């Protein structure tokens, strides 16, 4: 079995693959202050709760946009699983050609998403990831990573409202049903949800105009279903795109079950 670990700024997602199939997955809060032992105990408890034998893990792959956690999780996997993880970064084979001014600047999560989406759907593609940041990337018909856009995520945009506007309350992330809100909460929900729908539609249109092709639009991330249900610009929702990409990269680099 292969353990894939995707460390984001807000959440860390783990998945176990067996014979090309995702058989178990978890989402926890990312905490760079946890020690290797704390993460180790947490992982083992999750495995035990799902009746998964951690001793049957044959390989581990790790992607992180939080640099301090790479060292912590490497210590954890070495100590508790007796395995050195493959860390996604420069020098790792991905099968994707990064057509960027500085390929080293591309986030590991974006590379992993591009690998998964191209492997599963072919190209050309636009990939939208609703995470701490909302990221867009374009992949050519030949599997080249062409570049992208980075916008604030839904969560941090809403947090800015709460933090800088004293009278605005925290609101539940849900579709208000109409754009013209009849109260403060509905107005905020409209601005947050429909505002992000507009962001997605505008950037996807600009990407399509610049690509001069008809790409398929794939969306992933924690709040993807909320936005995808309000627009026709998203063709497919793939909640496990990043984990799948990690698994494909593990196989490309010789980590097999």
UniProtKB/Swiss-Prot annotation:
This enzyme's EC code(s): 2.7.1.33
Chief place of localization: cytoplasm
InterPro entries recorded: ATPase_NBD, Type_III_PanK
Domain of life: Bacteria
Active-site residues, Swiss-Prot/TrEMBL: 109
Catalytic reaction(s) noted: (R)-pantothenate + ATP = (R)-4'-phosphopantothenate + ADP + H(+)
Metabolic or biological pathway: Cofactor biosynthesis; coenzyme A biosynthesis; CoA from (R)-pantothenate: step 1/5
Assembly description: Homodimer.
Function as written in the Swiss-Prot or TrEMBL entry: Catalyzes the phosphorylation of pantothenate (Pan), the first step in CoA biosynthesis.
Name listed for the protein in its UniProt record: Type III pantothenate kinase
Lineage of producing organism: Bacteria, Bacillati, Bacillota, Clostridia, Halanaerobiales
């Amino acid at each position: 079995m292969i353990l894939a670990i995707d460390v984001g700024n807000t959440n860390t997602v783990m998945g176990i693959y067996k014979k090309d199939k995702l058989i178990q997955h978890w989402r926890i809060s990312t905490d760079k202050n946890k020690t290797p032992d704390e993460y180790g105990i947490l992982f083992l408890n999750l495995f035990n709760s799902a009746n998964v034998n951690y001793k049957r893990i044959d390989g581990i792959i790790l992607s992180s946009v939080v640099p301090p956690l790479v060292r912590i999780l490497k210590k954890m996997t070495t100590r508790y699983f007796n395995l050195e993880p493959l860390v996604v970064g420069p020098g790792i084979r991905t099968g994707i050609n990064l057509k960027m001014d500085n390929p080293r600047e591309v986030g590991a999560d974006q590379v992993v998403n591009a690998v998964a989406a191209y492997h599963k759907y072919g190209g050309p593609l636009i990939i939208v990831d609703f995470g701490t940041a909302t990221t867009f990337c374009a992949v050519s018909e030949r599997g080249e990573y062409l570049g992208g856009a980075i916008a604030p995520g839904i969560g941090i945009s809403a947090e800015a409202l709460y933090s800088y506007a004293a009278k605005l309350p925290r609101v539940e992330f849900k579709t208000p049903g109409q754009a013209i809100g009849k109260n403060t909460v509905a107005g905020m929900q409209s601005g947050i949800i429909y505002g992000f729908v507009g962001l997605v539609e505008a950037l996807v249109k600009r990407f399509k105009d610049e690509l001069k092709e008809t790409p398929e639009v794939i969306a992933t991330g924690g709040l993807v279903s909320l936005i995808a249900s309000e627009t026709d610009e998203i063709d497919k929702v793939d909640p496990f795109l990043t984990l799948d990409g990690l698994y494909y990269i593990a196989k490309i680099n010789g980590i097999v079950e």
